């Protein structure tokens, strides 16, 4: 295929949040800690104030560039979990990258009209949002290399299934949008992570070719606020 110009693939959302606008504010105090080791997908041992604690990590990704021994993280006290703390962000490339995937749909809702449905069952999946004639699925992205944001950072059968469901909805006359939230501001464009999940990459480009709109937004953590920075395009690439 010829070089792709992503400008034709970016879908607008109905409620335009201004660049620099806060989309989420942590009410808890954020504390600096350091990673000792990642115990499993959702549990990390950290040091804070000279003591070791277990912290909940609400992000199933591999996060090898973010959660590794010695790296600086931000934690906050949380209730309702077996651990006292949750990891909020990790340091990379002179900035903190927000890691808590519980925030994704809260942030996404800021860009939607007031009247929307959540968690709509479609086939064997649930799509995050529906408004008017549009279905919208949200994905969080934390991996950036050489100013390119990549998703996923681990193979995702669920992500591939969502793309198939969005394509089926388009065939039925609905609009479909994939909203990608890049939780850092050092990316200039986005690509599916073909190296990590080639099957997702194939589904992604097939969906684009069939009319899926993709909207990619970048954010940064400033103090205790998550700030919307800007939209970025798909990277130009030669597909074979």
Curated annotation (Swiss-Prot):
Pfam families referenced in this protein's UniProt entry, alphabetically: SfsA (PF03749), SfsA_N (PF17746)
GO MF term list: DNA binding
InterPro entries reported for this sequence: SfsA, SfsA_C, SfsA_N
Top-level taxon in the UniProt lineage: Archaea
Cysteine-cysteine disulfides: none
Family (UniProt): Belongs to the SfsA family.
Name the record gives this protein: Sugar fermentation stimulation protein homolog
Organism of provenance: Saccharolobus islandicus (strain L.S.2.15 / Lassen #1)
